[in-house]
């Protein structure tokens, strides 16, 4: 995957550059070949109009240069594109530290290139096609890229919150600014422009492009809301400016197409409203396709690129709506639903569009620089320069007037508007590429220098002046207004981060100094080269700020009485600022956690969107956090689905057969059996289906007969057709009688069989109604046939009505479909519940992740306690709600948990593939095939069912970690477990009580609380930095085990467990657990498994507190600990050496001592790396337990008590002979031992056969050249987990039977008892 990532990163700029090059080459070729391409709305009417004025001459030139010599000029265009990109890269690199935007440098370079091209024919050949390129094509190539990239990178939540402000500025503000600019141009300039021409100029001048200002605001950490308003206004007013420009351009250059004022207003509304609708439709289609593609970067990037250009072209050319506004909506919708993009692809997608936007800006400003020097400066006089300066001042004043005009409204909606923000918005209204492109359009269409060249000159001048003056001074203005000041909490956070970086550097330096290869390095130079300074340290010298306010550490004062240093409490304002900063950082950390869960496949797309939305809404409100009440709405089912489900269930709700008593008389009993028989129901349904045909034919025949009788002339001979129709009508009437008899028989059978219960069913009521209708229909038909009633229009309508009502019997067929409809509705409800459960689970994990780092967010203890309380309270509330949800809908919880388990396994599988490929054990092709297999399964997981039936309670025992895989042990526990019931509020266990057994929750929800940080269950709510006497709470649900630690240590309960609902549990007494521990001693023994489960549970929070594991998820930490094992301390005489092969050493139980310093270490504790040897004191009440994790690179044998006797003897034998035997013979001996062990395990041989088959220790020692050991007597030692050479053992029970022991020589010459093969003594706890 890493190699694939590198390839994609290399591919992004190459594809982007190639795309731009192809577009520009095709554009220059087409513009040169066909003059001007009519692509805007204003040019749709008449292509001939575009060839007026100087258009014909350019057409001729373009024809000569385009068609006849296209292939000769194409490489020159590519040279220009490549050279422009090179100049852009050099300018961006060289002028990065200067306050001048690099686009200004490119514009100047383009102008210089244009001047050189005017005097040097060789250079002019490479710029000719660019200088004469159609400006419409320029817009269509670059504008979609610039618009989509800006919208796609915007904060959607902030934009939507400020949308009303943006619309006012982009619509009404643009119109006012355009009118004022037009009035200024008409009265200031001596160009004799009319109002239409001046409005066209005003629209161009009002199109803003504040890219440089927005980037600067982000770099300075200024208000995100302000930057979003400025950028959002630019996006929308570009589209509105183009629409206004097209309206007045049509009035200027195409007067024959001039419309009335009302038509122009309608046209503006049509374009401005229909454009976003078109963009919304395309965005939904794009999101749909993206959501069905999994981890394919090329396809997803291509879809967004194609959607962008198709949206702009189709909307702008075919639909005649605003393509700009359509692309804006497209970018915003795709951005808002970016969860439809694969997490692995999202980064590359952003980089791709950033690269395209960079190339587009680079080429636009280079091209405009060339065009301006060759076209705009031709007819410029001194007065034009004066006009330019006045115009620059005027448009700045006009923008300030517009913002001031609408400020009463802007300050009361959205995020509001302060006077400081208004000043920045006024000064930050830069002009850019859109205005230049529109000016080129005017220059291309105008036939006189008064319009075309002046438009281009003034537009280019305003662009340069705003970029050079406004963009370079905006930072100074921010500093003057105090908007660039870094708050005290931010400085404190930065200082804390730098301090932690220094601590990490010091640890790394100390570690490297002990490296034998780096021992002679110059550490002074290394330390100086790695020095990281605080970026905000220079700001602390601000003369306006008090010295104590800028102190990054804790401020203290001297007590006048005792002269002691007393910490100062922050002022209310400081406390509020620190609390607000901590709140925002906490919400940001929660959002990061949500995104991480989504990237790992642990959170659904819609769940991520909801959680991020809740976090962003909370961030907008002061002192607000994510509310549990808002989260509860995700899994609360409301609306039409519950109502529809109830109605459908009411339609099919009938009394059960057992609930309807059988009649006592014989005929009634027979009818009862008939009406409840499946064949009876099927027969009636078949009759209903067959009855549909005559009902339809009756309508057809009746209409046919009516038409024939109407067409027949009086006294004329009628053909034989009516007689045939009459026969058909008679047959249909007879069939109606037959079906009526069938339905009547059905009603009689049900009435006789059900009695008074017949009328209870809604369907029986419906059948009775239809039966009455059919009877009335027959009576009316017979009456008409006999002529008792005069046939007229009214009678015919009555007959048709009754026949139509008779056809309603077909609705009864839907009775069979109602269960299917209920399943569909249940599926929708389950999807909503699954989404809600996913939201709650994601929130819980987010709070747990934040809890690990919250101590490093805040230095103030009061704020820290408050944030912890808020986080833990919200987590517990959601845990409780999800427990109640699981009780009501267990299948939902099972489905979500199953999906998470599957994705975790697949993630680990993919990481393993990457590790194997990185180590060279897999080729790229092999790794790709394996990874493709994993990703196919990941994609299938996206369509997993939202509900899975929960397993039976017996299966919960199989899922207990220390029971999994051992069927004999499971049967043993199942036989001795008792199922207990507890009501709401009952106490299952109480803190301080003696441990009497284990509890496995089968159903319901319990609350657990206690003062110990390591509560006795599977999910200890450990919070980093918790106080010693703090009370911990948590909720447990199905599958959790309570009481393992108490059974092992025989200590009193350390927590109280109460029922939050009615609860069912499996209870295994402590006596039965002791019997099981004594009985099941084969590898791996039950006691070892129990201790290992407890060890991993205790070690997980200890490991996650360490700095090196801060970026790890809980699953990854547990996976890391799975490589660990419990050390058999009895074998090593309660001493343990810590060498370089050990990565983590955790004291789980008891007390240890540092052998060198005699420092006491109490459990639970992660042993420091500075400790190299531990000693332990064995006591009968508290036996020490040590859990170690070896390095991943360690490949040696692990004698940890997990191996059975055969494995240990084999490993010890191999270890002893490894230095005295060649590889061949050592391998032969190891193979022989392996075969013997396999045969012993399969046959279950006795101990005597074991001595005959397994090589004797003395034989091994003789083969290795070691003298046999002499047996000696020694005092018994504490018992170990499993028997092995050199261990002290006593009389044991194997599978419930006592085994006599015989002395065995130990390696140290000590005598120890021997047990039967595979037996393990229990550990005294």
Swiss-Prot record:
Q: In chain numbering, where does the motif Essential for sodium:proton exchange fall? A: 237-238
Q: Which cysteines are joined by disulfide bonds?
A: none
Q: Which GO terms describe its cellular component?
A: plasma membrane; sperm flagellum; sperm head
Region named Disordered: 28-68, 1237-1325
Annotated consequence of substituting residue 803 to Q: Alters the half-maximal activation voltage of gating current. Shifts the activation of the transporter to more negative voltages
Q: Please tell me where 3',5'-cyclic AMP binds in this chain.
A: 1043, 1045-1046, 1053-1054
Q: For this chain's UniProt record, which GO biological process terms are given? A: potassium ion transmembrane transport; regulation of intracellular pH; single fertilization; sodium ion import across plasma membrane
How does this chain sit within the bilayer? Multi-pass membrane protein
Q: Which stretches does UniProt call biased (Basic and acidic residues)?
A: 44-68
Keyword Transmembrane helix included in the entry's annotation: yes
Q: Which Pfam families match?
A: cNMP_binding, Na_H_Exchanger
User: Which compartments is it annotated to reside in?
Assistant: Cell projection, Cilium, Flagellum membrane
Q: Where does 3',5'-cyclic GMP bind?
A: 1043-1045, 1053-1054
Reaction equation(s) it catalyzes:
Na(+)(in) + H(+)(out) = Na(+)(out) + H(+)(in)
State the residue spans of region: Interacts with the transport core domain: 605-620
Residue span of region Interacts with the S4 segment of voltage sensor domain: 575-620, 860-919
Indicate the quaternary assembly.
Homodimer; the dimerization is stabilized in the presence of phosphatidic acids.
What's its job? Answer: Electroneutral sodium:proton antiporter that regulates intracellular pH of sperm along with capacitation and fertility. Activated in response to egg-derived chemoattractants, couples membrane voltage to sodium:proton exchange and transduces membrane hyperpolarization to cytoplasmic alkalization to cAMP signaling and ultimately to sperm motility.
Family to which this protein belongs: Belongs to the monovalent cation:proton antiporter 1 (CPA1) transporter (TC 2.A.36) family.
State the name under which the record lists this protein: Sperm-specific sodium:proton exchanger
């Amino acid at each position: 995957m890493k190699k694939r990532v590198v390839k994609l990163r290399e591919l992004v700029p190459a594809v982007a550059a190639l795309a731009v090059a192809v577009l520009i080459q095709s554009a220059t070729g087409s513009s040169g070949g066909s003059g001007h391409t009519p692509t805007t709305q204003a040019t749709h009417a008449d292509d001939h109009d575009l060839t007026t004025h100087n258009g014909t001459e350019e057409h001729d030139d373009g024809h000569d240069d385009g068609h006849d010599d296209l292939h000769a000029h194409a490489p020159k265009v590519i040279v220009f594109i490549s050279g422009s990109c090179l100049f852009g890269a050099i300018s961006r690199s060289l002028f990065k530290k200067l306050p001048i935007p690099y686009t200004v440098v490119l514009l100047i370079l383009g102008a210089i290139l244009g001047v050189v091209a005017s005097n040097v024919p060789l250079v002019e050949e490479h710029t000719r096609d660019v200088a004469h390129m159609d400006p419409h094509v320029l817009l269509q190539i670059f504008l979609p890229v610039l618009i989509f990239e800006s919208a796609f990178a915007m904060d959607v939540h902030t934009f939507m919150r400020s949308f009303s402000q943006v619309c006012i500025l982009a619509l009404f503000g643009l119109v006012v600014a355009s009118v004022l600019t037009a009035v200024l141009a008409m009265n200031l300039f001596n160009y004799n422009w009319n109002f239409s021409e001046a409005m066209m100029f005003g629209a161009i001048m009002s199109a803003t492009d504040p890219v440089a200002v927005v980037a600067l605001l982000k770099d300075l950490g200024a208000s995100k809301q302000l930057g979003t308003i400025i950028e959002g206004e630019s996006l929308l007013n570009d589209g509105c400016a183009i629409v206004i420009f097209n309206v007045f351009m049509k009035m200027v250059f195409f007067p024959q197409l001039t419309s009335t004022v009302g038509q122009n207003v309608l046209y503006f509304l049509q374009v401005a409203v229909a454009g976003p609708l078109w963009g919304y439709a395309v965005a939904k289609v794009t999101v749909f396709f993206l959501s069905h593609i999994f981890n394919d970067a090329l396809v997803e990037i291509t879809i967004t690129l194609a959607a962008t250009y198709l949206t702009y072209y189709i909307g702008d050319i075919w639909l005649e709506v605003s393509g700009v506004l359509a692309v804006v909506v497209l970018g915003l919708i795709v951005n808002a639903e970016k969860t439809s993009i694969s997490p692995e692809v999202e980064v590359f997608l952003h980089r791709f569009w950033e690269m395209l936007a960079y190339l587009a800006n680079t080429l636009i400003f280079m091209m405009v620089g060339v065009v301006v020097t060759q076209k705009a400066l031709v007819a410029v006089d001194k007065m034009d320069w004066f006009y330019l300066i006045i115009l620059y001042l005027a448009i700045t004043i006009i923008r300030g007037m517009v913002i001031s005009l609408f400020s009463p409204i802007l300050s009361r909606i959205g995020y509001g508007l302060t006077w400081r923000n208004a000043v920045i918005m006024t000064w930050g209204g830069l002009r850019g590429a859109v205005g230049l492109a529109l000016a080129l359009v005017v220059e291309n269409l105008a036939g006189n220098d008064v319009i075309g060249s002046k438009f281009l000159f003034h537009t280019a001048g305003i662009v340069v002046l705003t970029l050079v003056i406004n963009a370079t001074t905006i930072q100074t203005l921010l500093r003057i207004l105090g908007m660039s000041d870094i708050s005290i909490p931010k400085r404190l956070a930065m200082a804390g981060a730098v301090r932690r970086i220094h601590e990490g550097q010091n640890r790394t330096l100390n570690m490297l100094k002990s490296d034998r290869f780096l021992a002679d390095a110059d550490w002074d130079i290394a330390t100086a080269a790695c020095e990281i300074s605080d970026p905000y340290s220079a700001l602390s010298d601000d003369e306006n700020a008090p010295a104590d306010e800028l102190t990054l550490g804790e401020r203290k004062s001297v007590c006048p009485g005792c002269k002691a240093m007393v910490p100062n409490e922050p002022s209310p304002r400081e406390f509020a600022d620190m609390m607000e900063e901590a709140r925002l950082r906490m919400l940001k950390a929660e959002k990061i956690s949500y995104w991480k869960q989504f990237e790992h496949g642990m959170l659904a797309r819609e769940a991520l969107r909801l959680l991020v939305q809740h976090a962003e809404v909370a961030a907008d409100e002061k002192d607000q956090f994510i509310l549990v009440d808002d989260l509860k709405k995700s899994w609360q089912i409301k609306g039409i689905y519950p109502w529809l489900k109830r109605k459908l269930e009411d339609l099919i709700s009938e009394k059960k057969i057992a609930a309807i008593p059988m009649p006592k008389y014989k005929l009634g009993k027979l009818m009862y059996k008939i009406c409840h028989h499946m064949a009876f129901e099927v027969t009636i349904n078949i009759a209903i289906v067959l009855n549909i045909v005559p009902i339809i034919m009756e309508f057809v025949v009746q209409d046919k007969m009516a038409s024939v009788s109407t067409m027949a002339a009086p006294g004329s001979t009628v053909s034989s057709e009516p007689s045939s129709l009459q026969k058909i009508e008679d047959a249909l009437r007879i069939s109606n009688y037959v079906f009526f008899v069938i339905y009547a028989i059905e009603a009689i059978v049900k009435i006789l069989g059900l009695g008074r219960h017949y009328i209870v069913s809604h369907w029986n009521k419906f059948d009775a109604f239809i039966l009455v209708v059919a009877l009335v229909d027959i009576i009316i038909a017979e009456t008409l046939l006999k002529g008792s009633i005069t046939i007229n229009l009214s009678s015919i309508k009555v007959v048709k009505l009754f026949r139509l009502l008779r056809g309603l019997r077909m609705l009864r067929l839907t009775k069979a479909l109602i269960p299917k409809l209920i399943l569909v509705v249940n599926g929708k409800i389950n999807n909503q519940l699954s989404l809600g459960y996913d939201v709650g689970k994601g929130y819980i994990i987010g709070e747990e992740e934040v809890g690990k780092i919250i101590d490093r967010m805040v230095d103030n203890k009061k704020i820290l306690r408050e944030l912890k309380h808020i986080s833990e309270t919200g987590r517990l509330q959601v845990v409780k709600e999800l427990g109640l949800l699981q009780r009501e809908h267990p299948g939902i919880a099972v489905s979500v948990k199953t999906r998470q388990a599957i994705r975790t396994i697949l993630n680990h599988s993919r990481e393993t593939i990457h590790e194997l490929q990185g180590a060279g054990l897999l080729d790229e092709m092999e790794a790709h095939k394996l990874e493709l297999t994993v990703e196919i399964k990941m994609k299938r997981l996206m369509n997993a069912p939202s509900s899975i039936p929960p397993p039976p309670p017996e299966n919960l025992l199989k899922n207990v970690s220390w029971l999994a895989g051992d069927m004999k042990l499971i049967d043993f526990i199942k036989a001795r477990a008792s199922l207990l019931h507890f009501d709401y509020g009952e106490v299952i266990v109480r803190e301080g009580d003696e441990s009497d057994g284990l509890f496995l929750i089968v159903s319901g929800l319990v609350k657990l609380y206690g003062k110990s940080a390591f509560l006795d269950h599977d999910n200890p709510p450990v919070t980093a930095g918790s106080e010693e006497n703090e009370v911990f709470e948590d909720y447990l649900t199905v599958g959790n085990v309570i009481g393992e630690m108490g059974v092992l240590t025989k200590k009193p309960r350390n927590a109280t467990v109460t029922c939050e609902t009615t609860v069912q549990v499996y209870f295994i007494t402590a006596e039965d657990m002791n019997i099981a521990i004594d009985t099941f001693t084969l590898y791996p023994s039950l006691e070892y498994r129990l201790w290992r489960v407890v060890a991993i549970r205790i070690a997980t929070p200890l490991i996650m507190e360490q700095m090196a594991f801060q970026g790890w998820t809980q699953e990854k930490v547990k996976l890391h600990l799975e490589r660990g094992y419990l050390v058999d301390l009895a074998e090593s005489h309660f001493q343990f050496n810590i060498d370089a092969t050990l990565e983590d050493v955790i004291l789980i139980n008891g007390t240890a001592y540092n052998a060198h310093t005699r420092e006491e270490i109490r459990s639970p504790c992660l042993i420091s790396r500075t400790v190299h040897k531990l000693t332990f004191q064995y006591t009968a009440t508290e036996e020490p337990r040590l859990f170690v994790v070896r390095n991943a690179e360690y490949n040696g044998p692990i004698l940890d008590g997990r191996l059975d006797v055969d494995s240990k003897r084999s490993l010890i034998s191999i270890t002893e002979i490894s230095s005295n035997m060649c590889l061949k013979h050592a391998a032969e001996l190891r193979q022989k031992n392996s075969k013997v062990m396999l045969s012993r395990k399969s046959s279950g041989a006795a101990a005597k056969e074991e001595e005959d088959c397994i090589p004797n220790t003395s034989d091994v020692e003789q083969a290795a050249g070691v003298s046999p050991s002499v047996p000696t007597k020694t005092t018994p030692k504490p018992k170990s987990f499993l028997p092995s050479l050199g261990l002290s053992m006593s009389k044991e029970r194997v599978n419930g039977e006592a085994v006599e022991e015989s002395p065995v020589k130990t390696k140290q010459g000590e005598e120890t008892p021997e047990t039967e093969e595979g037996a393990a003594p229990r550990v005294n706890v």
